[in-house]
């Protein structure tokens, strides 16, 4: 018996131009007033891998995250745990693409933020000059995260 994610991947519609390995160029945020800021610091790091069946793995990290003073993951302070969580975003599952309306749908199997597990998240996207960019749905405060990725292969 196939898991629901595996069954979904078999029927997945993937834009062939998305398949490959992408490195993060920018993780910005568009504020309601039209200004733009850095969501994961000045030099965010990340990797997005999408295979030909639509399976994906995505990681975004703030490069400037401080190390835990104790050196022990189980003994961090409240501030250290907050920085670790807020300085990263990771999830995996399958992704499908509506190539007419230019919408990516991430079918999230697991995520660093547990509330996303089992969710489908839609993002408008474009590919131009070897770069993939997409906009995440607005946050409760109106901010719109924007991710920009550059193809590695």
Locations of regions flagged by a protein language model:
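Lipid interaction determinants
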Residues: 2-153
């Amino acid at each position: 018996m196939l898991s629901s994610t595996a069954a979904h991947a078999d029927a997945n519609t993937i834009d062939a131009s998305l398949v490959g390995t992408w490195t993060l160029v920018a993780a910005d945020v568009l504020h309601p007033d039209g200004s733009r800021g850095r969501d994961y610091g000045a030099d965010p790091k990340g990797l997005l891998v999408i295979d030909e069946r639509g399976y994906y793995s995505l990681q975004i990290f703030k490069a400037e995250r401080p190390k835990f003073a104790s050196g022990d993951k189980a003994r961090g302070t409240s501030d250290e745990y907050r920085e670790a969580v807020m300085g990263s975003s990771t999830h995996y599952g399958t992704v499908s693409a509506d190539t007419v309306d230019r919408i990516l749908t991430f079918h999230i199997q697991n995520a660093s933020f547990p509330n996303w597990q089992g969710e489908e998240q839609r993002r408008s996207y474009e590919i131009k000059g070897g770069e993939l960019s997409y906009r995440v749905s607005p946050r409760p405060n109106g901010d719109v995260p924007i991710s920009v990725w550059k193809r590695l292969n």
